[in-house]
A protein has these predicted regions:
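Short, conserved beta-strand element in jelly-roll/cupin
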Residues: 132-150
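A structural signal for short, well-ordered beta-strand segments and their strand-loop junctions
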Residues: 31-33, 105-108, 145, 153-156
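Double-stranded beta-helix
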Residues: 149-174
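Non-heme Fe(II)-dependent double-stranded beta-helix
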Residues: 2-26, 33-133
Length: 174
């Protein structure tokens, strides 16, 4: 590919990321499609199931320990699938632009998996990941979907980020 064309593509991708960040700051969330290629999604799923299937009785423990489908145990955030996802170039680029820095430190607190044969009734789990006493934008959480998520999914409340400080002030966290 011609280097001029390649530079234009990089510039266009950069501008698109900036547009998504503008939407994030306005609405409190944004959906960015195609952050991972199909090949990267397949690799991440392969690595996840390799880890998941390596732990005896994990499904039984998981269904008992967490009613929301979130894996928080067995060092999930340090497994190969977690590192694979967080080191993808597009993900890194998004967070570089979001925080306006080249120096990133990231965490991966868990992952969500609910098998198709799960019969548990879903319950809302409304919460915020930003600490109650923090003001302004101090926490951005990414969610990388490896499936279509047409049965269960993440729920976000548009512009709820604008109520964070006021809500916790009323709860006397400040």
């Amino acid at each position: 590919m011609d280097s001029e064309i390649e530079n234009r593509i990089i510039l266009l991708e950069s501008l698109i990321i900036e547009l998504y960040i503008t939407k994030l700051r306005e609405y409190g969330y944004v959906v960015i499609p195609n952050v991972l290629t199909d090949t990267e999604v397949d690799e991440a799923k392969t690595l996840f199931f390799k880890w998941k299937n390596s732990i005896p009785d994990l499904d039984k423990f998981h269904n008992t320990a967490d009613p929301h489908g979130i894996f928080k145990f067995h060092q999930v955030g340090h497994q190969e699938h977690a590192w694979f996802i967080r080191t993808r170039p597009k993900i890194i680029e998004i967070f570089k632009k979001l925080w306006e820095t080249e120096e990133l430190v990231v965490s991966f607190d868990g992952c969500c998996y609910i098998p198709k044969n799960c019969t548990k009734k879903d319950k809302l789990w409304t919460h915020t990941d930003q600490a109650p006493c923090n003001k302004g934008e101090t926490c951005f959480q990414g969610f990388v979907a490896l499936t279509k998520n047409d049965e269960r999914t993440l729920i976000v409340y548009e512009k709820s980020h604008l109520l964070h400080e006021e809500y916790f002030k009323k709860k006397k966290y400040y």
